[in-house]
Amino acid sequence: MGRTREAGCVAAGVVIGAGACYCVYRLAWGRDENEKIWDEDEESTDTSEIGVETVKGAKTSVGAGSGVKLQGDSKVKPEVNLGLEDCPGVKEKAHSGSHRGGGLEAKAKALFNTLKEQASAKAGKGARMGTITGNRTLAPSLPCPGGRGGGCHPTRSGSRAGGRASGKSKGKARSKSTRAPATTWPVRRGKFNFPYKIDDILSAPDLQKVLNILERTNDPFIQEVALVTLGNNAAYSFNQNAIRELGGVPIIAKLIKTKDPIIREKTYNALNNLSVNAENQGKIKTYISQVCDDTMVCRLDSAVQMAGLRLLTNMTVTNHYQHLLSYSFPDFFALLFLGNHFTKIQIMKLIINFTENPAMTRELVSCKVPSELISLFNKEWDREILLNILTLFENINDNIKNEGLASSRKEFSRSSLFFLFKESGVCVKKIKALANHNDLVVKVKVLKVLTKL
């Protein structure tokens, strides 16, 4: 702001000085007398310019222009020359005007116009000087992390427009760059006039309305609210039957194919509550393979994966539909090794359901498993994981004995579950090492398993 104001003062001073000179000429001297004065001025131009050049820049011209006094010829001459020091072509224009017949008046007008142009040029230069160091703007070519568009890397362009204005503009730019990154999935709207609360216990007509809304809408937010409402109502046995009789299972299950992980999670939760009912399991079995495939390929340890595992666990509590998932045994054991604490517990509950069905024993022990699975028999794991893995080993060992598979050991490869649990001997050593575990419950379970070997 200081440079712009200084340039404006210089321009104003030059214009005022030129106008004052012209007024002095018109009012104080006559035409003929001023012609003589101007001729004398032309003759002494060289000597006067030498004296004037020792004065510094525009500040001297401002002081001279604004401080004009009618004291004599010697005062007027340096004032005119000061205005001309940055524009050597002014004298030539004045001379050309006089030779054309305009006389001293034409010279003065030419001088006035030239000074005016010089002032405008100085003002423009000052404005440019004040705008070189400009605002910090967002570079559109550099993407902002997590954002959909624009950039967050500052570049210099534009005008400063003063200290306060530039401070405000910088503050706005910073506030834009600190916005939360846009999400991959559709943004959930905060308000929607849904006819019911998600925790309301609905009657059959109300459930029909919710199912109709879910069937007709493509809005992710409405789908989520409807699925949560149906899932909460499916926790009650009377509504489990009502939703099935209203044809709600296919309407809910069609959302398994959606790409939105939130919608898939809510879909699995609703189907999980419905699967507690045996008749509903007969409807859900159509989609169990699709649920299993999606659960195995989705992001590891995600909420969608946990919801899918819970649904598969409920569907395998009975022996009716376990054969539909036998092709996924290797994936289950791989997930048991790779998953986090909660995934390990949930997948072990699922596998234990298969071990309690003797008919599934051969397929189960013949599948390939990672050798690192033996690390689960380590005392560093907590009680729940140790109890589940010991139960898994106990059930498989009992089934091998009951089904007479011990004599068929040649049928199984060295990478199979049969070889890892029965033939390698490493598993038995690990279990014996747990006999001195600090947890009494784990110690009792270990002793029970060892007595059956």
UniProtKB/Swiss-Prot annotation:
ARM repeats: which residues? 195-235, 237-276, 358-398, 415-453
Bilayer topology term? Single-pass membrane protein
Q: Which PANTHER family match?
A: ARMADILLO REPEAT CONTAINING PROTEIN (PTHR15712), ARMADILLO REPEAT-CONTAINING X-LINKED PROTEIN 1 (PTHR15712:SF14)
One Gene Ontology cellular component annotation held by this UniProt entry: mitochondrial outer membrane
| Mitochondrial intermembrane topological domain | 1-6
Q: Which residues lie on this side of the membrane: Cytoplasmic?
A: 30-453
Which residue intervals make up region (Mitochondrion outer membrane (MOM)-targeting sequence)? 1-6, 26-36
As for family, the record states:
Belongs to the eutherian X-chromosome-specific Armcx family.
Name one matching Pfam family. Answer: Arm_2
Which UniProt keywords are present, listed alphabetically?
A: Membrane, Mitochondrion, Mitochondrion outer membrane, Repeat, Signal-anchor, Transmembrane, Transmembrane helix
Q: Which residues cross the membrane?
A: 7-29
InterPro entries for this protein: ARM-like, ARM-rpt_dom, ARM-type_fold, Armadillo, Armcx_regulator
Q: What name does this protein carry?
A: Armadillo repeat-containing X-linked protein 1
This protein's record includes keyword Nucleotide-binding: no
Q: Where in the cell is it found?
A: Mitochondrion; Mitochondrion outer membrane
- Chief subcellular location equals mitochondrion
Q: List where Basic residues composition bias occurs.
A: 167-177
Disordered: annotated segments: 140-182
So what does this one do? Answer: Regulates mitochondrial transport during axon regeneration. Increases the proportion of motile mitochondria by recruiting stationary mitochondria into the motile pool. Enhances mitochondria movement and neurite growth in both adult axons and embryonic neurons. Promotes neuronal survival and axon regeneration after nerve injury. May link mitochondria to the Trak1-kinesin motor complex via its interaction with MIRO1.
Subunit relationships: Interacts with MIRO1.
Does the keyword Ligase feature in the UniProt annotation?
no
